[in-house]
Design a protein with these regions (language model features):
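Fe(II)/2-oxoglutarate oxygenase catalytic core
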Residues: 1-159, 167-188
Length: 188
């Protein structure tokens, strides 16, 4: 086993085809987004962490989202082959895709993805992997930062997979120009 935490962050370049990225973004014009909130397991409440700077998100269905969702299986398979851990071969599934929208001055506070609130209904489990996808790169700012200070270089169509636990804190810096679109799903 490799002891370097960075080893378990896998970037799959151009995993999402440009045409699909463009189609998803175009179709998002018709979708209502809501202010993103984190679930606080101590207070059992949802709350923002960045006040007026909090990004917006949606689980809404848009044309192309199902195609992308089905292809995530292959990305997860690639990741499991990459980390090559014979004792970690099974997973039950992954959540429906959540789409994040960052307009100017919006960000996501530092956090880890050990999320339990997404498994309150039909799905049962604990997230083991986070899958992030980047639908565009024609904006300024909005850098994904891991471990407080490590900027992840990502481009349109890239997919990033990493463990969903306290060892992988991450945030998104404020967007300074344009609109940043990304997707997220959690493997359980």
């Amino acid at each position: 086993m490799i002891n370097d935490l960075n080893h378990y962050i896998m970037r799959q370049e151009k995993f999402i085809p440009d045409e699909l990225c463009n189609k998803l973004i175009k179709n998002l014009d018709e979708v209502e987004f809501e202010t993103h909130q984190f679930y606080n397991s101590y207070t059992k409440t949802y709350q923002t962490a960045s006040d007026s700077q909090e990004l917006e998100s949606t689980f809404s269905d848009v044309d192309g989202k199902d195609d992308l969702g089905k292809s995530l299986w292959f990305a997860i398979k690639n990741y499991l082959e990459y980390i090559d851990m014979p004792w970690f071969t099974s997973w039950a599934g992954y959540t429906t895709i959540k789409i994040n929208k960052y307009t100017e001055n919006k960000k996501m506070a530092i956090h880890c993805d050990h999320i339990h609130s997404i498994f309150d209904g039909e799905l049962k489990g604990v997230p083991t992997l986070s899958v992030l996808g980047f639908l565009n790169d024609d904006y300024d700012g909005g850098e994904l930062v891991m471990f407080d200070d490590q900027v992840c270089e990502v481009k349109k169509g890239d997919l990033l997979i990493f463990p969903s636990n306290f060892l992988y804190p991450h945030k998104v810096n404020p967007v300074t120009k344009g609109v940043r679109y990304s997707i997220v799903s959690w493997v359980y």
